[in-house]
Design a protein with these regions (language model features):
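Alpha-helix C-terminal capping segments
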Residues: 138-149, 172-174, 192-198, 216-218, ...
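Conserved small-residue-rich beta-alpha loop and adjacent elements
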Residues: 103-169
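Short internal beta-strands
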Residues: 149-159, 263-270, 276, 347
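C-terminal core of ALDH-fold dehydrogenases
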Residues: 318-424
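Conserved NAD(P)+-binding/catalytic subdomain of aldehyde/semialdehyde dehydrogenases
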Residues: 175-246, 250-253, 257-262
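N-terminal Rossmann-like NAD(P)+-binding subdomain of aldehyde/semialdehyde dehydrogenases
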Residues: 1-119
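A conserved active-site cap/scaffold subdomain adjacent to cofactor or substrate pockets
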Residues: 227-299, 303
């Protein structure tokens, strides 16, 4: 059963409860895979596909015929859903596009900043027991909107050597350039270093298991990465007017993801807390993934009862959750009090699943408290900004003495000389 706590009796570390430890051998395993793929390229990828996925792969790249077949056999209703979701995601992310700017308010001086998309992006899409076409849309479309010219996707093949057709349909809908049949840390290595088939990219995005996350951390610096994603989190901030069955269902929407997922309710109502506690016991046995949800709720879930709504918001800001549902009477009235959250779902009719699949804001979000200093995946992740400056000879001459003086005070006389030599 989910545990119930009083906020005023908890220490900060008890509120957070993120003591997730990786297996001791993960680092060594990932180091070996990275080195192997870097040395042997495609051959190593094919061996790992057989070893980890049971897939015998002849050609790593997905063919156009495979993509066409996926579309031909896809449920038309779901294809329309994909297209509508993609349109929503694109419309939202187009609002994130920055404009270059120029300043020329001083005689002979032009200053500015310009945005340039990265050239190649790598998108990792998990495989395993479930297919995640939503991840494809969320990770690819911002890159497309940003203007990335080459978007390379990797995802594990099934035992039949084929990629799930739902993933292929989503990739084609989103605008992926190339798709390759490889997963795990080996896919991250291929995207970072390149192989005979897979081009090295400039940045890798997308969620994965502990091996994928560790590999991304290790190749950072050779390439950019979006974030190191931990287990999924949901925090429901609810007042006494909420339906406990709805709250329980929302908590379980994340609990079914992973045994390490963290479902949390923060409320100013003791009655709601106890009702949700009971409702979870009713709903968990009804789920197809009941064992996973049970482990998540019992081991990582909690209900925190606060004396008032402002204290409840304080708890939310300490936790800095990935997903924050604000299920209160006036959600917009408290929005500005919320400082730390990956994505904020306002009102009682906005379940987290709406954002996961359809509304438009990105669902690749900071976890493990990193919403204190980081943001959801977006167009910014796929662009670079460069400043530029231009001075005429006369404009430089006006400020040259000050520049030279500044440089000499730092003991950098060559800096000073690079200015003064122009006027000798």
């Amino acid at each position: 059963m989910i545990k119930l706590y009083q906020f005023d009796e908890l220490r900060p570390e008890e509120i957070l409860n993120r003591d997730i430890r990786a297996e001791k051998n993960v680092e060594d395993v990932v180091d070996g895979i990275l080195a192997d793929v870097r040395a042997r390229g495609d051959a190593a990828l094919k061996e790992y596909a057989l070893k980890f996925d049971g897939a015998s792969i002849e050609e790593l790249q997905v063919t156009q015929a495979e993509i066409d077949e996926a579309f031909a056999n896809m449920d038309p209703y779901f294809l329309e859903t994909l297209k509508e979701a993609a349109a929503n995601i694109e419309a939202f992310h187009r609002q994130q596009v920055h404009k270059n700017f120029v300043m020329n308010d001083k005689p002979g001086v032009v200053l500015g900043q310009k945005y340039t998309p990265i050239e190649k992006a790598g998108v990792y899409v998990p495989g395993g027991t479930a297919a995640y076409p939503s991840t494809v849309l969320m990770d690819v479309i911002p890159a497309k909107v940003a203007g990335v010219s080459e978007i390379v996707m990797t995802t594990p093949a099934g035992k039949d050597g084929r990629v799930n057709p739902v993933i292929l349909a989503a990739a084609a809908t989103a605008g992926v350039t190339k798709i390759f049949k490889t997963g795990g840390a080996q896919a991250v290595a291929a995207l970072a270093y390149g192989t005979e088939s897979i081009p090295a990219v400039d940045k890798i995005v997308g969620p994965g298991n502990i091996y994928v996350a560790t590999a991304k951390r290790k190749v950072f610096g050779k390439v950019g990465i979006d974030m190191i994603a931990g287990p999924s989190e949901i925090l429901v901030l609810a007042d006494g007017g909420c339906d406990p069955a709805w709250v329980a269902a929302d908590l379980l929407s994340q609990a079914e993801h992973d045994k390490l997922a963290s479902p949390v309710l923060v409320t100013d109502s003791e009655a709601l807390a106890k009702a949700v506690q009971a409702e979870l016991e009713v709903q968990i046995p009804q789920l197809p993934r009941a064992a996973i949800a049970r482990a998540s709720v019992d081991d990582n879930g909690k209900i925190i009862v606060c004396t008032d709504l402002h204290k409840a918001i304080e708890a939310c800001n300490i936790i800095a959750p990935e997903h924050l549902e604000v299920c209160v009477e006036d959600p917009f009235g408290v929005l500005n009090e919320i400082k730390n959250a990956g994505s904020i779902f306002l009102g009682r009719n906005v379940p987290e699943a709406l954002g996961d699949y359809f509304a438009g804001p990105n669902h690749t979000l900071p976890t493990s408290g990193t919403a204190r200093f980081s943001s959801p995946l977006g167009v910014d992740d796929f662009v670079k900004k460069s400043s530029f400056l231009y001075y005429t000879r006369d404009a430089l001459e006006v400020v040259a003495p000050r520049i030279a003086d500044f440089a000499e005070r730092e003991g950098l006389h060559a800096h000073a000389r690079s200015v003064t030599i122009r006027y000798e």
